[in-house]
Design a protein with these regions (language model features):
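A short beta-loop-beta micro-motif enriched in histidine and acidic residues
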Residues: 99
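Surface-exposed acidic/polar loop and edge beta-strand patches at domain peripheries
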Residues: 1-75, 79-81, 92-95, 103-150, ...
């Protein structure tokens, strides 16, 4: 959830800013992060622990979308994979948006940390056009007073980012499915006492459902149709 933790899931019908479309209100980042999981199971196999569950969003007369999630954790290396399938269980086409919002803080995020990625920057929330994200060393500077958050948008490129932290002595590798996550968002709040970096495979930018519909980033799932999203996190010692 957005109260804390490594992963906050955004969707299923909207992500980004709150908007109203055709008389229906869509809250910031959607409802799925507040929806309890159902049918939760776990299984231990040689080399792997797997947890599965489902969660659905929908109201009478509105599209019915369901998330089926599998967490797989390796017992041989520091690797976690998240495999999500979002399906339209209704009888009419359903607009769909989705994002894996991954949060990182100290000591992974410090002034000595570096982000390496081949994603292709396409803009920022405030309308500026950024340079290569790997060259933005200010990503990791901690402010001496409260500052506004910053958001960068990128095309997913090869679907990989690496966060290297000499202070923590680790390299974190993030890989995601570029066929279903065509966008990548970097969110940074450098305020003292916050110091958080968000790395976010996404289907769209941050303007909300109305903007996504105008830009062509809103996905329409037909009845019975499903999309699969994959994100993998690997941590290695330097």
């Amino acid at each position: 959830t957005f109260g804390g933790g490594l992963l906050a899931t955004c969707g299923l019908a909207s992500t980004g800013a709150p908007t109203e479309v055709d008389g229906m209100a869509y809250g910031q980042h959607g409802r799925i992060s507040h929806t309890p999981a159902e049918q939760v199971t776990w299984q231990v196999e040689p080399g792997e622990v797997r947890i599965t569950g489902t969660a659905g969003v929908g109201t009478p007369g509105a599209p019915a979308l369901r998330l089926s999630r599998t967490f797989s954790a390796s017992t041989k290396e520091a690797r976690l994979s998240i495999v999500d399938m979002v399906s339209n269980e209704g009888f009419a086409p359903a607009g769909h948006m989705f994002r894996h919002h991954l949060n990182f803080g100290y000591p992974l995020v410090s002034e000595n940390s570096r982000l390496t990625t081949e994603v292709i920057p396409i803009g920022t929330r405030d309308g500026a056009r950024p340079g290569p994200l790997s060259a933005d060393q200010f990503l990791f500077r901690v402010a001496d007073r409260p500052v506004d958050e910053m958001v960068w948008y990128a095309d997913s490129g090869d679907g990989r980012a690496e966060l290297v932290s000499p202070d923590a002595g680790v390299r974190l590798k993030l890989d995601w499915s570029i066929d279903t996550f065509p966008r990548f968002i970097v969110w940074r709040n450098a305020s003292p006492g916050v110091n958080v970096l968000g790395l976010e495979p996404s289907t769209s930018r941050d303007g909300g459902r109305a903007e996504a519909a105008e830009s062509g980033e809103l996905i329409m799932l037909q009845p019975g149709e499903a999309r699969t999203y994959v994100t993998e996190i690997t941590v290695e010692r330097l």
